Amino acid sequence: MISVEKIDDKTFNVTVNKSGTTQHKVTVPDDYHQKLTKGQISKKELIKRSFEFLLEREPNTSILRSFDLPVISQYFPEYERTIGV
């Protein structure tokens, strides 16, 4: 289960309950949100989909505890192609 809680316009707390519970702090720059979604989905939904993407590739215990969303593409080059609308 993935739970996303908004802290402010760019920062979110994410709780993942799979193989134990982990907490993550994720920052989503406005321009990156626009680039990936063209404004068609919310930042919360983008983060949820991004964590689903990550969980298909690694356990929640391996996901960084705090990161900017663009960092995902440094580890998984296919991320932007896969997640974008």
Question: Regions from the language model: what does each represent?
Answer:
Residues 20-23, 27, 73:
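Long, contiguous binding/interaction regions
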Residues 24, 36-37, 50:
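A short, polar/proline- and glycine-enriched secondary-structure boundary/capping micro-motif
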Residues 1-23:
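Short, charged/polar N-terminal "headpieces" of proteins
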Residues 5-10, 35-36, 45-46:
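Short amphipathic alpha-helical surface micro-motifs
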Residues 31-40:
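Short, surface-exposed linear segments at secondary-structure transitions and domain or protein termini
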Residues 27-29, 68:
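Helix N-cap / beta->alpha transition motif
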Residues 40-85:
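Acidic, low-complexity intrinsically disordered segments
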